[in-house]
Curated annotation (Swiss-Prot):
GO terms for molecular function: actin filament binding. Residues 176-188 have a biased composition (Polar residues). GO terms for cellular component: actin cytoskeleton; nucleus; synapse. Disulfide bonds: none annotated. Calponin-like repeats lie at residues 174-199. SMART domains: CH (SM00033). InterPro entries: Calponin-like (IPR050606), Calponin_repeat (IPR000557), CH_dom (IPR001715), CH_dom_sf (IPR036872), SM22_calponin (IPR003096). Keywords: Phosphoprotein. This is Transgelin-3. Residues 24-136 form the Calponin-homology (CH) domain.
């Protein structure tokens, strides 16, 4: 963490719970996908959450990733600078987040800049990258590079069209889900609260 001291008490417990959500196997899969997707000379980071954070922290890898998901000439982030200044790095991370939202990642799946830059919640960073990969696989526009089975495909709209005659036929059928229209009924039942008449 950049400028934060150690946490104690309840905040320590919360931080430990957040850190338990981080998945090392998922980290390896995401690193492999990012390197394959960017198709550039991006060095493979050593394993571990701290190295993964350091690898993504300046925002250049993330910006290259989102640019690689667009056709050449349509990249959302035209200028990527490898700067050592903190505000430039945080600006690049926020540019990536805006571009990811424009690409189709839901706002609920997007991490906050401090989650990555200060290493507060690297599991949220993993969730965002997984959501980005899922959207890329679902779009199937030829820009995704990698194994399609690495990410789940999001559900697509599948509209059905029925003619008026088919709709009328459906109204005449009593479905099995409704049960039988024969047998026991409530005929002869008395109202609620009335005594039962036994003769």
């Amino acid at each position: 963490m950049a400028n934060r001291g150690p946490s104690y008490g309840l905040s320590r417990e919360v931080q430990e719970k957040i850190e338990q959500k981080y998945d090392a196997d998922l980290e390896n899969k995401l690193v492999d996908w990012i390197i394959l997707q960017c198709a550039e000379d991006i060095e493979h980071p050593p394993p571990g959450r701290a190295h993964f954070q350091k690898w993504l922290m300046d925002g250049t890898v993330l910006c290259k990733l989102i640019n690689s998901l667009y056709p050449p000439g349509q990249e959302p982030i035209p200028k990527i600078s490898e700067s050592k200044m903190a505000f430039k790095q945080m600006e690049q991370i926020s540019q990536f987040l805006k571009a990811a939202e424009t690409y189709g990642v839901r706002t609920t799946d997007i991490f906050q800049t401090v989650d990555l830059w200060e290493g507060k919640d690297m599991a949220a960073v993993q969730r965002t990258l997984m959501a980005l990969g899922s959207v890329a696989v679902t779009k199937d526009d030829g820009c995704y590079r990698g194994e399609p089975s690495w990410f789940h495909r999001k559900a697509q709209q599948n509209r059905r069209g029925f003619s008026e005659e088919q709709l009328r036929q459906g109204q005449n059928v009593i479905g099995l889900q409704m049960g039988s229209n024969k047998g026991a009924s409530q005929a002869g039942m008395t109202g609620y609260g009335m005594p039962r008449q036994i003769m």
